[in-house]
Amino acid sequence: MNPMPSALPSDFLHVDLVTLSPLILLAAAAVVVMLTAAFYRHPRPVMILTLAGLVLSFMALFLSQGTASSQVTTLLILDQYALFFIGLIVVATFVVAILCYRYFGGGESRHEALYILLLLAALGGGVLVASSHFASFLLGLELLSISLFALIAYPRFTEHPLEAGIKYLILAGFSSGLLLFGMALVYAQLGTMQFVKIGTMLAAPGAALELYGLAGLALIVTGVGFKLALVPFHMWTPDVYEGAPVPITAFIATASKGAMLVLLLRYFLMAGAHQSHSITFALSLIAVATILVGNLLALLQNNIKRILAYSSIAQLGYLLVGFLAFDQLAIEAVAYFLTAYFVTMLGAFGVVTVLSEGFNGGSAGEFHDAGEKDSDRLADYAGLFWHRPWLAGVFTAMLLSLAGIPLTMGFIGKFYIVTAGVEASLWMPVITLVIGSIIGLFYYMRIIAVMYGWGPEAAGEAIMLRAASPSFAESATLAALALLLIWLGIFPAQLIGVLEGAGGGLT
């Protein structure tokens, strides 16, 4: 008679639980917030619990570092690479949660469910960046997407968010269908859904994807292209960015897109997809088109949210240039640029959020429930410097970083990306990146000129002057983002050292 299998060692369980603790704490925070909202309907304690859960999850990342490079299950790998980007997503969610409070009416409104959805979306993003299997890929993606549907359409009495939510729902469902079909085709040929096993099988002598396997890989890239808003899958982005509440737009632009890009890089490197010349050539064309289309269409916009939407499309094109190098330098370049992109977009949308609070003289809750528009027209920012100089300064720093001006994180990030592209001989994407950056200067400087170009007497009639003053938490958050942007733009060595360690396990 065979002996019964022994139980798992306690130290094994301890290591796994410690490694998974950032994700476990996010899930636990969502449950606690849900129960609190059910028994005590007031947004302040719910927001405080949300922020506390995010802080605990972030602190748990430091405990997980000692057990990193751990394949805790067949579905998840919590290495330094995953932990770094989970931390980035948690920080982005923390900032968005702070921005949401007054935007949705502060203590006078009932928006407790918003924080539950934010925590679930952050959990979905965390699962995505740690995925090493198609099942966890799909689980994280759907958890993130379903939360975003509700977040985008959250203001109940407004037409624009509902329209944006429906658009996102339809296109996200379509892209998920493409991803599923692509995964099925890859599985049909290789018989496995683990990224590492896919890479091992394709690395064997004489092994290659057959036609339907290549079709499956192409469908996966197409589905991810929709999520990242890469050209020609970008058409939903301006409408959703314009219609969604401003803090939620910030979350989509940062945590949602960042998680998808991080997952795509892991999949390409672990599964050996970067060895397919047809796929890399197609991605090169997509990168070139994304940079040009994003920058050129941004020139035609008079709405701040639409300008930032097209700018985010172009920024993802820049990231693809570094992505295509597929080496250690490329991983560091993508990680640094993505970090700069998070900081910059959170700061830019943070300023728009603050100026949209209490717009038209009412409280934030009255304004947004009344179906009025955000403070997002370019004309609303005329003379901002003369009455809100520090807000104009923060917004200027963010725009200069997006443009890649020296002494900002954006400059270091672009320099890193160009270096990786040149070393990989990606001449056409690199040249396009330089051209796109020059085009981008025009619409970034246009916004800056509007903020500084009007005199005090003309600015006195600007609509944005009736916006509410930012809270201490909002002011501190925006100031921290601006200081971080400049500090890491001048002294990037410490962050680069962290990224070298984080990306080392992927190559």
From Swiss-Prot:
UniProt EC number: 7.1.1.-
GO biological process terms held by the UniProt record: ATP synthesis coupled electron transport
Subcellular compartments: Cell inner membrane
Membrane topology (UniProt): Multi-pass membrane protein
Keywords noted in UniProt: Cell inner membrane, Cell membrane, Membrane, NAD, Quinone, Translocase, Transmembrane, Transmembrane helix, Transport, Ubiquinone
PANTHER family: NADH DEHYDROGENASE
Family label: Belongs to the complex I subunit 2 family.
The protein's name: NADH-quinone oxidoreductase subunit N
Organism for this UniProt entry: Nitrosospira multiformis (strain ATCC 25196 / NCIMB 11849 / C 71)
Gene: nuoN
